[in-house]
């Protein structure tokens, strides 16, 4: 029988807010995904990274802000997104591989990092609903304009 392909979408709150919560929730997701593999499905997984990218961006910004020697700069959002995708994908890949091996299933598991394309003229930017990172004053934001990567502009 040919495997049917399905997409599993793990949403915003699927992983929790802390690393221990994420490890626990990733393990539960891996068990459910392995159940689907046992039912002969080919799985494609997509996931949110909102809370995680926000935590990374906040940490990187605060670290750069507190660095009196100015050895560190603020990481652009595109890199923070890649970092969060990378570590979430890494955790998922390892948990799924472990769960499959524990069940005697020898299938490859891999992670692909994606890029997000944002329309800078999207009207949603006029009324943001979710804060990512530290809230800045107008003066701080204006001073940071020169820090944008071309890919972030």
What do the predicted segments below correspond to?
Residues 1-46, 56-62:
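N-terminal glycine-/serine-/threonine-rich phosphate-binding loop
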Residues 28-30, 64-67, 131-132:
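Alpha-helix boundary/interfacial micro-motifs
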Residues 31-34, 68-72, 135-139:
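Glycine-rich loops and low-complexity Gly/Arg-rich segments
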Residues 37, 41-127:
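Glycine-rich nucleotide/cofactor/substrate-binding loop typically near the N-terminus or early
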Residues 112, 118-148:
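Hydrophobic alpha-helical segments and helix pairs
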Residues 149-153:
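Conserved small/polar residues in nucleotide/adenosyl-binding loops
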